[in-house]
Amino acid sequence: MGYIITKTVSIVLISFLFTIIHYLVIIIIQSTTKSEKIDGDRFLNNIWFYLIFFLFFGLFLLLITLIVEKPAVIFTLGIFLILIVPFIQPFIPMIPNIGDDIQDSFKYIPFTYLTEKMTGEIKFSHWQWFISIASIVVLFIANMLYASKRDI
């Protein structure tokens, strides 16, 4: 159980590190282009977004790592989820009869809306907040149970 808690804490620290790097890049770009300052609310939104993004994908891939134990599968799945899914998503409505329904359901699947928000506006609906946090809790519990079952 200590292994999973340590991994989760490291994921949280990495998310804070990425937030700080992201914010520093924004400050450097703002100072070189003499644009308006970024407000503090946007910075706080970025902290929450990166925390949710890294915890969700980190805990999901950690669970897959515990189950599969093959690094190539985890690497391929990570690339697929973060790079390929957003590329394929605009083509889903072209599927006859069910494409629009699938596209509507993407608003409630963290794999799709978290990667979509990486390149767009970081605004969550109430359901997306709930689904994200609930998914993180479920993934954390699943990791704990699987790790205790394997005696890690």
PLM regions: where:
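Secretory targeting signals
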Residues: I4-A72, G78, P86, L114-S132
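Terminal transmembrane helical anchor/hairpin motif
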Residues: F75-Y146
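Short cytosolic juxtamembrane segments of multi-pass membrane proteins
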Residues: A147-I152
